[in-house]
């Protein structure tokens, strides 16, 4: 594996947020519990992803877990209380749902780099990422029904779109675990590489993506998500279209005419069929 010098962009307690040549890397840093997340972990990830979204130097975002044994094992059951996962303020939350939605609407590709276990809510995080590079030691699966939990959102509905309804039911009803090759065969990941090559492969995919039009990638992500995200997905794609329209001379003519208190001259712009 190439020894890269990742730059720390911000210090957190339960995650790492780093940068390397146009790539932001968000790492869940709780290896002692297989990178299970708490409300604080999720809040820190939301903050880091939001910063990556706004950072013009970031083209692609990588989500991973600290160490080689786990990507993420879902919510920390020791923090689970009445009505949700209890944070330092003693308020029960399921703020991971906000994180899932954020990953979907960020107009930049998000790649899951999976080493070891991606189970429970960890597998759902894998599911909502745009692409997945899996190490050959990766293990995937859902555990909710074993521990009195479930994900009736992306973790089931979108999972069924990816692997098929019969397979998704098998994953949830039986709570089995699947190795990296099985995950590849069902379409849950994009590629499988040796553990010591997984970061090299992930960076290579990022570099290839970064050669392409960011506006085209933004619209492609929004279009593919709109199919499963309903009106919220359409709103995202429409918002992206509005931002693009604001950069045109036609939109600027309307703005300038209003500011100059005159009628706009839209006749100068083409009306393509």
Curated annotation (Swiss-Prot):
Its EC number is 4.1.3.36. One of its GO terms (cellular component) is cytosol. Its cofactor is hydrogencarbonate. Keywords: Lyase, Menaquinone biosynthesis. InterPro entries: ClpP/crotonase-like_dom_sf (IPR029045), DHNA-CoA_synthase_MenB (IPR010198), Enoyl-CoA_hydra/iso (IPR001753), Enoyl-CoA_hydra_C (IPR014748). Hydrogencarbonate binds at residues 142-144. Substrate binds at residues 34, 73-77, 85, 117-121, 143, 149, 246, 261. The record marks 85, 246 as: Important for catalysis. GO terms for molecular function: 1,4-dihydroxy-2-naphthoyl-CoA synthase activity. It catalyses: 2-succinylbenzoyl-CoA + H(+) = 1,4-dihydroxy-2-naphthoyl-CoA + H2O. It is an enzyme of class 4 (lyase). Belongs to the enoyl-CoA hydratase/isomerase family. MenB subfamily. This is 1,4-dihydroxy-2-naphthoyl-CoA synthase. It comes from Staphylococcus aureus (strain N315). The gene is menB.
